């Protein structure tokens, strides 16, 4: 039986446009790749790559604790169903709630911080809440990837990363210009 990898994101189009090569490389390495994202019209394209897709209900920009709690429960159930060898998370809600679900299920996971977003731009109660959520979501990550040094410095300064947490700054992501 193939080992599986679960990829959590908040956008099927973003996953397809910016992470298609990652998905393909994982499958070429022999993994069964599961993808959990909301369906905005790209899930069929992701399925055609060979991935197993799990449509996910998520408010990308909302801050409703009940809906976010449902997302956390959905991730927990998905982990129990798939039993992945590892989980890759992208974007804020999958990073936070996927990270918590993985830690509770004792599933190894990697976090990718693609940017900090507008909620972390200004000091205040909302920033404090998001920092606390990030700290909780990333506390068990095997590695946290950043796309620039500034985001890494911010997360360190705010105490979102434990000293033992491995971090890497990668050269970012983008659209494959050859397609």
Language model features with spans:
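Nucleotide-sugar donor phosphate/pyrophosphate-binding loop at the beta->alpha transition
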Residues: 17-18, 66, 70-73, 108-110, ...
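Acceptor-binding helix/loop patch of EC 2.4 sugar-transfer enzymes
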Residues: 112-128, 157-158, 163, 176-178
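N-terminal strand-loop element at the rim of the active site
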Residues: 8-66, 154, 165-166
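Alpha-helix capping/helix-boundary segments
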Residues: 41-42, 93-94, 150-152
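Donor nucleotide-sugar binding/catalytic pocket of nucleotide-sugar-dependent glycosyltransferases
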Residues: 54-55, 135-179
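Short beta-strand scaffold positions
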Residues: 37, 88-89, 146-147
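Active-site proximal beta-strand in glycosyltransferases
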Residues: 4-6, 102-119, 134, 145, ...
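Short His-centered aromatic/hydrophobic patch
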Residues: 89-95, 113
């Amino acid at each position: 039986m193939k080992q599986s990898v679960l990829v959590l994101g908040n956008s099927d189009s973003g996953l397809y446009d910016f992470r298609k090569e990652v998905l393909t490389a994982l499958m070429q390495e022999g993994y069964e790749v599961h993808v959990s994202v909301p369906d905005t019209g790209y899930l069929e394209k992701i399925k055609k790559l060979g991935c197993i897709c799990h449509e996910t209900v998520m408010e990308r920009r909302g801050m409703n604790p009940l809906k976010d709690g449902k997302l956390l429960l959905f991730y927990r159930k998905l982990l129990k169903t798939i039993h992945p060898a590892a989980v890759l998370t992208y974007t804020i809600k999958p990073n936070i709630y996927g990270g918590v679900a993985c830690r509770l299920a004792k599933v190894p996971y990697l976090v990718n911080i693609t940017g900090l977003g507008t909620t972390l731009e200004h000091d205040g109660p909302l920033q404090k809440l998001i920092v606390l959520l990030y700290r909780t979501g990333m506390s068990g990550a095997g590695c946290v990837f950043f796309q620039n040094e500034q985001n890494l410095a911010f997360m360190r300064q705010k105490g979102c990363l434990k000293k033992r947490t491995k971090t890497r700054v990668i050269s970012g992501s983008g659209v494959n210009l050859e397609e």
